[in-house]
Amino acid sequence: MVQCLVVDDDPRILNYIASHLQIEHIDAYTQPSGEAALKLLEKQRVDIAVVDIMMDGMDGFQLCNTLKNDYDIPVIMLTARDALSDKERAFISGTDDYVTKPFEVKELIFRIRAVLRRYNINSNSEMTIGNLTLNQSYLELQVSNKTMTLPNKEFQLLFMLAARPKQIFTREQIIEKIWGYDYEGDERTVDVHIKRLRQRLKKLNATLTIETVRGQGYKVENHV
C-alpha cells in the first residue's frame, strides 16, 4: 500500500485528506509541522508527501528541499499561496506538483497517483524481473535467499530502469528523474552508480544486467 505523508498546521485539513486517502487505500501519515514530519521519517518510510507552505518553524519550501535532497521523496505542495513567485520558489525547492487551496480532494488524489506513476511507485512498492525482486519500501534486492540493501539513489536508478526493460535512458533523462532537473553536479555520477549496480547484481547472480548503448545511454536486459 502507498504511504503518503501529509504536513499541514490545520488539523481539519489533515483529517479531511487522511479520510479520503484511506478510502482510496492509501496510508496517510499526518503531521502538523515540518519538524514533526522529519521526526516521523526517522522511523517510517513514505512514498510521497503533500506539504503546506505556511507553517510555523520550518516552512513548506524548506521541508520540500529536505524531502527531495535527503530522502528523495516526491512532493506535492498544497497551499493557499497562488502567486507566480510562490510557485516558482516551490518548483525551485523541488516540488513535483503544486495545488492551491481551496481544492478538490479528488483532484489531489488524481495528482498523487500521477506523481507516483512518474516515480514508478505502485501500491506494493515491489517489482520482480527475472530472478530479482526489488522492494522499494526497504530499498532491498533479493535473489533466492540472498538479500542486499542499496543506497537510495542506486535503488531508485535500478528501479526506474527495471520498470522499463529494453528502454534506453540517456544520462540526462536519468539525472532529471533521479537527481532532479536542477542538479548541477557531474553527469558522470550516473556512470559511477551504474558501475556499482552492476557489481551488486553480479554478486547476487541476478539474471538482470544493465547494458550500455553506445552514444545513447543505458538499458536493462533480463537473461533467463
Curated annotation (Swiss-Prot):
Residues 3-116 form the Response regulatory domain. Residues 124-222 bind DNA. InterPro entries: CheY-like_superfamily, OmpR/PhoB-type_DNA-bd, Sig_transdc_resp-reg_receiver, WalR-like, WH-like_DNA-bd_sf. Keywords: Activator, Cytoplasm, DNA-binding, Phosphoprotein, Transcription, Transcription regulation, Two-component regulatory system, Virulence. The modification 4-aspartylphosphate is found at D52. GO terms for cellular component: cytosol; protein-DNA complex. GO terms for biological process: regulation of DNA-templated transcription. CDD domains: REC_OmpR, trans_reg_C. Phosphorylated by HssS. This is Heme response regulator HssR. It comes from Staphylococcus aureus (strain Newman). The lineage of its organism: Bacteria, Bacillati, Bacillota, Bacilli, Bacillales. The gene is hssR.
